[in-house]
Amino acid sequence: MAADHYVYVLSCADETLYTGYTTNVERRVAEHDAGEGAKYTRGRTPVELVHTERFDSKSAAMQREHEIKSLSRAKKERLVADETG
């Protein structure tokens, strides 16, 4: 069985947004919260998961991660609001 691939957005303690890729969202968020995630999120804990998208392939997920990372903060906030609103 092939693994699912996810793109996720975290809200950091300093009110910034971080976008990443993983095959296990729960584990990855826990790593970020423990200071074991990306250098960017270290010192910006706690983090809160605010958006996820699932993909069947790593390449599709990585492409979407790149797209989200290129968005302005306002567009990222709209993306998050669309999911939670």
UniProtKB/Swiss-Prot annotation:
Q: Which domain of life is it from?
A: Archaea
Domain GIY-YIG spans what residues? Answer: 3-78
Enumerate composition-biased segments (Basic and acidic residues): 58-70
Q: Region Disordered: start and end of each range?
A: 58-85
Q: What SUPFAM superfamilies would the database entry show?
A: GIY-YIG endonuclease
InterPro entries associated with the record: GIY-YIG_endonuc, GIY-YIG_endonuc_sf, UPF0213_domain
Would you identify the family this protein belongs to, as annotated?
Answer: Belongs to the UPF0213 family.
- What PANTHER family does the record point to? UPF0213 PROTEIN YHBQ
The protein's name in its UniProt record: UPF0213 protein NP_0776A
Task: Give the classification, highest ranks.
Answer: Archaea, Methanobacteriati, Methanobacteriota, Stenosarchaea group, Halobacteria
